[in-house]
């Protein structure tokens, strides 16, 4: 069930002051059942308000104030479903879309690495998600926990309009906006049913059951985990200010102009983290159920310790423990151990002493797992102007010029995988992680740009106008996040546009259409690189033909048609690596399995059909197994992915063809009018990947909608009904990938199923 309510009230406070308040709410029950909990999810709970106040200070001065606020607090997911073909090397095979809502194979992901270090496996990394419960039904999913979605936005604008004279008007504006966004998702998209056998299984210990906390202190939760699982958290806060002052002319002659100054100041803190049971236990051994067992076994309390160095040492101690305990038992019974047993016991004692000598570490919950954290400030200033010249009564020329001063200051935090760099840099000694020496990179991108516009419009008849324009623009560069905060360049765009706006057939046809070409230099495309999204610059060309036509077949019958035909491709020979498929091959011919000396699966390998051998650790790629240990913040010394050319590829997420058609019929009556409208919408196939891999193909989308409404002659109210997606076909309309560290699982959004409802509105 869904309820959508809107309303507005005009309030004439005085002869010179008037106000208007508007509100809206959108509530909907969940459309998807979480089979694991029995709860409904994917609901809606939105509320918004808007207040405007206009004050006529005098005959030439007006002050306008506007405030709007919006809040969403529900359990909608970021995407409806996931896809994966489990693969022991990649996590998810990059060569096929795979099955709906399958989890990646742990052996090819950071989840498996975290689990191994966190003592969840008895000796080697296994695919503990292999028997997980999953669903291929849109309406029924398996999730350990329903998602949470919270967003709050506020925006205020103050505008002063002053008529300086009959010919000149001054407009000054100031606006301020804020946004807070928090989203939590079940990242693995399944309910894992495999117990966490644990590294202590050889000592006769039962499977691990742990009380684990995820997220942050202000945005997270704690739960009891009997199996491994992964959650992701997006936490974004930003605010922006805009200032603008301009002068607009209204001369009687052929020349007019507008000129002004604009400033923009934007600040954001964007955090994204992925956490598993293993990552959270690694942060503090005091949270691990093995802590009291180890204390009893060794006579040493390690509950104050944590982090990768401690856990890796503890793995060695646990491996040595059965033999050491046997030797100690023999000595207690008066038996003489062998020399090898005595040496092993001595080594065991040294290992325990080494662990005890490590400094105490308790990694904060929000630093455990993977964390991408960027603080960005964007500042820009611009001087601009446009001049308008009426060449004659039917022809107008527009000339524009804009000067921009663009700046991007970015601070990127890099605490390392599992906070390994944070520990090594002395992070526990600092209250604020941003103050830890060596863990933040501060970089500034500054540039200036001059752009322009030239346009001409010509009335061929009173109701037929053609135009042509050429416009250039620049978007500033910035810094990528994650463990490789490399800069990306500015983006320059030049657009040429030819169009027609006309009323034809004595006003029975309204027609707007245009042909355009965008020439983009340095267009930003998002790719995947290890634990984060990574922007690259490419040159691209976009050519399109779009239009809108409305035809009145009679006084009571009309049709509407819109269309967009686009050819969009990458034109530069930009070469970059595909971290989801680093070899540039078409398949794997041999899985090498664990290739680390102890056969733990800490490092795995595979031979590809192009003859290359690649290695992975925690989902990270490398062309060599040597000097490669992401868990210790030691990343690949050689190539992480073969560079491939993107030239000739289609731009991601751009459909070649899209159009809509609507038929409207009016049925006039003595007391009012009934209108019936049937609409059809079509969007063609597209691909969501800069590398155009087939698993990112998005099929064509089609839908029929129907609207029936009755409005009385006085127009004071209306009543109607609607039905959307009459055929009840759900289509994928977006797809993206998780990182290679997450196994490259795909996340897809789909159109809503068929829905219908009643509408009613009134003015009073």
PLM ranges: what are they?
Residues 25-29, 69-73, 176-180, 263-267, ...:
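Transmembrane beta-strands of outer-membrane beta-barrel pores
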